[in-house]
Amino acid sequence: MNVYDDVLDATVVSHSLATHFTTSDYEELLVVRTNILSVYRPTRDGKLYLTDEFKFHGLITDIGLIPQKDSPLSCLLLCTGVAKISILKFNTLTNSIDTLSLHYYEGKFKGKSLVELAKISTLRMDPGSSCALLFNNDIIAFLPFHVNKNDDDEEEEDEDENIDDSELIHSMNQKSQGTNTFNKRKRTKLGDKFTAPSVVLVASELYEGAKNIIDIQFLKNFTKPTIALLYQPKLVWAGNTTISKLPTQYVILTLNIQPAESATKIESTTIAFVKELPWDLHTIVPVSNGAIIVGTNELAFLDNTGVLQSTVLLNSFADKELQKTKIINNSSLEIMFREKNTTSIWIPSSKSKNGGSNNDETLLLMDLKSNIYYIQMEAEGRLLIKFDIFKLPIVNDLLKENSNPKCITRLNATNSNKNMDLFIGFGSGNALVLRLNNLKSTIETREAHNPSSGTNSLMDINDDDDEEMDDLYADEAPENGLTTNDSKGTVETVQPFDIELLSSLRNVGPITSLTVGKVSSIDDVVKGLPNPNKNEYSLVATSGNGSGSHLTVIQTSVQPEIELALKFISITQIWNLKIKGRDRYLITTDSTKSRSDIYESDNNFKLHKGGRLRRDATTVYISMFGEEKRIIQVTTNHLYLYDTHFRRLTTIKFDYEVIHVSVMDPYILVTVSRGDIKIFELEEKNKRKLLKVDLPEILNEMVITSGLILKSNMCNEFLIGLSKSQEEQLLFTFVTADNQIIFFTKDHNDRIFQLNGVDQLNESLYISTYQLGDEIVPDPSIKQVMINKLGHDNKEEYLTILTFGGEIYQYRKLPQRRSRFYRNVTRNDLAITGAPDNAYAKGVSSIERIMHYFPDYNGYSVIFVTGSVPYILIKEDDSTPKIFKFGNIPLVSVTPWSERSVMCVDDIKNARVYTLTTDNMYYGNKLPLKQIKISNVLDDYKTLQKLVYHERAQLFLVSYCKRVPYEALGEDGEKVIGYDENVPHAEGFQSGILLINPKSWKVIDKIDFPKNSVVNEMRSSMIQINSKTKRKREYIIAGVANATTEDTPPTGAFHIYDVIEVVPEPGKPDTNYKLKEIFQEEVSGTVSTVCEVSGRFMISQSQKVLVRDIQEDNSVIPVAFLDIPVFVTDSKSFGNLLIIGDAMQGFQFIGFDAEPYRMISLGRSMSKFQTMSLEFLVNGGDMYFAATDADRNVHVLKYAPDEPNSLSGQRLVHCSSFTLHSTNSCMMLLPRNEEFGSPQVPSFQNVGGQVDGSVFKIVPLSEEKYRRLYVIQQQIIDRELQLGGLNPRMERLANDFYQMGHSMRPMLDFNVIRRFCGLAIDRRKSIAQKAGRHAHFEAWRDIINIEFSMRSLCQGK
């Protein structure tokens, strides 16, 4: 009984497209991160501003586009799961996504396939938008779209037109294809359906003999849908190429699709067939007059008639025995385009001003290391006269930290391909927007300065029919200027190639290791006062690969920079008065003593005794007024107007206590406890009097709880003469006791407006003329509202609502309709901060929560929320607004300070000036992220692997791994017989351990291991060093594997280190610790994991695990061992209990006994899966286990000896299996925060990191909580519309292990449950009633407990 929740959203960009999806005003960029679809507005200077974002309940595996009928917008095809396609359309009225149709093919695919289906199917789109194609292995599904009957005639007329408005983006990583945005065939409705019936075929039904499909693509410039199939009738790999040297075949088929109401018929006609192609070809990239087939070792060009015109050899492994083709031998370049790590983009020729073609067709390829290659293609008719490849000479290191490109999309397409903006998503490294300048000039200058040495064309054309082509190609042979067989000279371009970084999207994936340690709370005292982040621990992860690898600090709260600290004796509220742009006066008040004081900010905070400020009363509000020439002070019963020397000018007395004040020059709005409001205007001429503003008469019938003066254009369409104006108007805004928000202008003429639906917190709100209800029931829940702009460079208007229960709701103003606000419930990722019905009284009882808006907090427009747990609302330009905890101490008051800072007062009367930390910080995910670079120019440690935290020294240790040239050495240390120095060699590894001080994040000590060694595991463990006294000491244990040749047995070693304190180096106070080796031992077999158990430590040696004990003389002896079926992938301990994961056979549950020494097998998993990581999952007194496998599943098993089918616990009971959207790489056990009461036994939770940059947690639940939340989840799934028509149950639970688990006890998905908090109030209560009489109250408490479970990191250990 557990619940899954995302701690961090995915950050790796897997797919992207440029299209008109939500608006026709500009071309948008659609970006996919695992299950999140983001829509960005690209600017001309390459900035990306988020406009919409949607979170789906399934893994998005591919996307495509088709045009809408009678609309400039496009529909989105979303491929999810194994084989599902959702067709989506953006609804501009509701600002959400509508699902037009859902097509499920998995069942049909399984019925026709003779082998197990691949986990992901591949989507292909016809350039003419007549159909879509989805294939999995040899099974192909066609989804036709309705077209006009006159299409054929229209296409014949348009046959000669150039399709240069199109653009093809092709990702070889998942063979994912975006689509062009043009529509050559006009679609129309057949009946009322959007699509025709689908057809599912085996590849051999299209072309006899087609099997083992490698790739399928639609070709271009055909009047009918035409596909190219690349396949191998007999599978071949590098080891058996001598038996079948050229096994790959290629066929071009034209499809005749005949849609009908009942069934669709597809007939195929063979255009061309090509055989005897190299075995390593893997991807088809269509171009204007044919296709480029990309292989690991070759590039081949086949035209649309199926003629293999030319082949480029990329490396020395390429097959030089190809027949009937022109061979360009560039094997000395040693380029490799691996199938899953190569991406391409094809851009057709642009049009010149006179309508002709510029002949600048462009094809770019990127390899695993992010090198960009230009494919040179020049043709005369269908004859290719130039075909070559060269690496773009990028002189800067913009792509040094990026690897594994996933997708490429062109932005801001212009009439020329000379310069282009490209958006590139990477598996490791930030997604980048790059500007390629002078691309054409680079190519031209390169051709003009080619060296004329040797020939690089190998001709072997024996067919008499190709003699003419032979002559043509022979003339072109000397034109190629790349490195040749006879000359090793290189070519340098005359014109430098300029690449410019315009913007980026933050990526922290892949996460390979997680630990918990002190980062923001290392210093107990800052500026003489306690650290505001005291007792706070952070999650720290290793992120990225290669030179881009770094540490990512996942902060549980915002860590501000402290500029100034002050200590006060009597203070509860604080205000800063600026005069002429300088901080002049600091006003404090103490409500407990009814006292106010003035301090001179520019005079070392000396107490100011002059002036007539009311000091013997509690100040409710004070600020500058009247163009900074006056000061306004409001006490509990009076309003005072002063000049800048605090000479009193006007006094106004109130009969009731003032509870709220809002000021905007030249108006002041006062709300009193009776529910009345007063509005005053400053006399314009002398600025010595306050004039009362007339209020609408209908306000006399209302009870007002708070008021606000703001500027907005949301009511313009209701104001005479302003319906089309964008100018912001001054609006007096009020919240009534029946939770209505009303507006009126100064010249109101008794006409006021209301925001409909806000009392129920509906998903969509709209402004209309106010209608007085028949009966008003005062039940105030809305405490405060704000309408202001949030963001960094691109600020957007939001309505923010704070309730008396501490909840924060946020609505965004519709860009299409200024009078409407909406809340995206499908992406409502605002943190939960409170609960209605007094369900979370603890959060709002001690210190009042009040929102404060700051238009410039170090460049960001933010909202602070004071309280016992303070919050900050902040928005990055490329993300939705987020709510974070601000520090780890209460805040009672906050005021602007200096230009970009704030001054805050805590609950013990300390004041601090905070500035937002922006260096290497990112506030666009669910928690603040800080990037820490360990490598530098001198020391590049490449990939950071295992990370641990040394609690006693408060230091981090991380292992690194860099690639080095591999040397095949025998057991004697000499090079093996047959070693050839002249061929490309494999790469080996070299590892080491770094000791890092988090105060400076500098490496203060390191240990390097020999070449061909890898640190597989590293742990910080409390090891018993004296068996009599049971004294323990914290040691670092590292397990190492040595990479040797195939003929030598594997070996490894384990090393034990202590972190000792030393005298620091002069001028380097952070170098006060060093690593000291305690013990090391070489062992037979690789050491894949180490683990502490009951004061000893366990290591794995190939198929054995041994527990070792450290003696007093620091020697180590083995005391117990156990055999493992295949290979240990992970191991964890809990006291004297162990779980050991196997690479093929699940995992075992082991008990360790020290008297006598032995390892006892308590149970094992019966389900056989490839264990990736595992952890104990403790729920009360029950012992559960969480294990993840290579198929993206997390399994929960239980040790239950009382279960009848468990054989007294020997078989672990399989409770549930839950599908993840990415591969899990690490998992750890953390204490769990209990927000309501303290449990009798400690509670825990699991936290795991994933390859896509996301982090998740698994939280155990009690039976009562589980049942309540299970009902709510079921109701939301059944009664609420799901994005893309996806079923959250199916996406998470439909896996191969579903039948083994308890069908009535599946793992819950908090992503579904938290939608409960975003529903309208009436729908929320309706759903809660299904779970019980008081379920609404209890459900909120359950949700808060899950939401706040990670706050255990803020309470120390």
From Swiss-Prot:
One of the GO biological process terms: termination of RNA polymerase II transcription
A Pfam family: Beta-prop_RSE1_1st
Predominant location: nucleus
Gene3D superfamilies: YVTN repeat-like/Quinoprotein amine dehydrogenase (2.130.10.10)
Composition skew (Polar residues), residue ranges: 450-459
GO molecular function ontology, one term from the record: RNA binding
Additional remark text: Present with 639 molecules/cell in log phase SD medium.
Subunit composition and interactions: Component of the cleavage and polyadenylation factor (CPF) complex, which is composed of at least PTI1, SYC1, SSU72, GLC7, MPE1, REF2, PFS2, PTA1, YSH1/BRR5, SWD2, CFT2/YDH1, YTH1, CFT1/YHH1, FIP1 and PAP1. Interacts with the phosphorylated CTD domain of RPB1/RNA polymerase II.
Protein's UniProt name: Protein CFT1
Protein species of origin: Saccharomyces cerevisiae (strain ATCC 204508 / S288c)
Chain's gene name: CFT1
